[in-house]
Amino acid sequence: MGVVTLQGYIVVPDTDLASVQDVLLEHIELTQREHGCLHFTVSQDTENKNRFNVHEKFVNRAAFEAHQRRAKDSRWVHIAANIERHYQISEDS
C-alpha cells in the first residue's frame, strides 16, 4: 500500500459559504495533526469564491480511511453537508 493522494475541489453554495469558512481552519488543523497525514490544504480559489481547491496526501490507505472516519464525527461534516465534491483519488504502488 502506497501514498494516497486526493486532489480536486469543492463547490460551496452561497448560503453555506460563511459557515464553511468559519470551520475550515479547524478542519485543516485537525487533519494536519492526524497520524499519517503528509499534506492537507484547502484553499479558496482566487477567481471563484465558492470553489475551494483541495490537496491531501496520506502515508497509506489506512491513514486516509482513518481521516475519513474522524471527519465524519466532526463539525466539518455537518457544516459541509451541502457542498459539491469533485475529487480524484490515487494510490502509489
Task: Kindly give the residue locations of the regions a language model identified.
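An amphipathic, aromatic/His-enriched active-site/gating alpha helix that lines ligand/cofactor pockets
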Residues: Q32-L38, K57-S90
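Short, conserved structural micro-motifs that define repeat-unit consensus positions
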Residues: H27, C37-F40
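Structural motif
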Residues: E29-Q32, Q44
